[in-house]
């Protein structure tokens, strides 16, 4: 890996100089001066997905400098290292091989002198057989009833990803009721337990380490609830399953060895939905659809690995993101899926991006003096239009946005979808081109308002535009297309981290909070005043404990 701070490259200097020249150019002018702009700045993926990046504040020259940056930092070598199984997660001495989980060609991937595809395929076969038994009613609970409810207990990547996908692919859902429990707040589990019957429910305990406090706490409470009804320890074998890399801890919990679906330390938690952590997805949509989901991701993997810099979708989107965060000074990026089934898509990539690239130390162990990962947020359209779009249109911040929509809806109720898509097109147009003073003035005059009213209202109606967007149009949200879309964003995150010279696959910041919370939890059980914390934490703890007397 090239451990170069990107602001020490010639490409960075070129971009810095170039930025001074174009920073005030409006998108209106960029489109007016180039009638081929859309054609040049858009890519179609497999005739299923259109990526339009023409409404970005870039020129041909910008793109040349950005692509030079990718070449100078040698992104292609980084891609090859990841796909080969090199230990690019240096701080944990691990490979990063979620791509192996969707390697549909079965190309051998050698790790520690072993072809890991043999284990991957064996796991997939085990998941297939189990899911078919559950879906077809052949797997029975402790009283002989078929399974109707599936409860996935996990947090972070073991929850956000599977939950997002099962929601996005709800049109492909079978009869099983899917529930997801993540929060250590007892309310989350309690409300799910109210809805289910222990006789026809299975619990999937999804934790790579099988030590995550939230997950294991919820799992123990679910187990206690189940045993209260079954009164039979052996009944756990019909109802509790572990999705984990830690076989020993799963066995100690009471999981039958045959009920453990393993995954490996080379699968990062936030990329684990492709692994056994995605068992709930397979149970929801069936094995055949899960295979198509993997196929779509594999197709994007091939595009990412083989396509040149200039036409490589994840590379281009990553470069454009870096352009905004490090030159325009934008702090956030928004993701707006115009599809209600995809209502958790933004939240999933909030975690994937911010946990991956929320770093301030470079790969040489030195503090960074440039911006790394942006804040990711978003909601489905059109809800967001009536919540926070106002700030994007007329606020003081630059907020690059991704708009995602299907051409065909799964629920084309009357003309609902055409209205939805009309909003999609209108918002990207309005954000790019805005509404100038002259055009508003002309319309106000035509409306025959008096001069005083025009003068009073005119400044407030101006929308400056020049807000950048990417538009991703997908033929339909299918398992294949969703798989490709997720892989696209995953690879974008990798490229961003690689160029920014950070390690994208650890999360040491998360670990600190875990350690401190355990210390405080132990202390809360002691009925003495705290003397070892800062004044604020001590005050909070003492106020809490005053109610426990």
Curated annotation (Swiss-Prot):
Q: Which GO terms describe its cellular component?
A: cytosol
So, what pathway does this thing act in?
Carbohydrate biosynthesis; gluconeogenesis; Carbohydrate degradation; glycolysis; D-glyceraldehyde 3-phosphate and glycerone phosphate from D-glucose: step 2/4
Q: Which GO terms describe its biological process?
A: gluconeogenesis; glucose 6-phosphate metabolic process; glycolytic process
Q: Give its E.C. classification number.
A: 5.3.1.9
Enzyme type, top EC level? isomerase
**What protein name is recorded for this chain?**
Glucose-6-phosphate isomerase
* Domain of life, per lineage: Bacteria
High-level lineage:
Bacteria, Pseudomonadati, Pseudomonadota, Gammaproteobacteria, Enterobacterales
Q: What is its main location?
A: cytoplasm
Record: active site: 355 (proton donor), 386, 514
PROSITE patterns in alphabetical order? P_GLUCOSE_ISOMERASE_1, P_GLUCOSE_ISOMERASE_2, P_GLUCOSE_ISOMERASE_3
Q: Which family does it belong to?
A: Belongs to the GPI family.
The family database entries (Pfam families) matched by this protein are listed as: PGI (PF00342)
InterPro entries assigned: G6P_Isomerase, G6P_Isomerase_C, Phosphoglucose_isomerase_CS, SIS_dom_sf, SIS_PGI_1, SIS_PGI_2
Catalytic activity field: alpha-D-glucose 6-phosphate = beta-D-fructose 6-phosphate
Q: What does this protein do?
A: Catalyzes the reversible isomerization of glucose-6-phosphate to fructose-6-phosphate.
Listed A to Z, the keywords are:
Cytoplasm, Gluconeogenesis, Glycolysis, Isomerase
HAMAP family, sorted: G6P_isomerase (MF_00473)
- Where do transmembrane segments lie in this chain? none
Molecular functions (GO terms) = carbohydrate derivative binding; glucose-6-phosphate isomerase activity; monosaccharide binding
Matching NCBIfam families, A to Z?
PRK00179.1 (NF001211)
Where in or outside the cell is it found? Cytoplasm
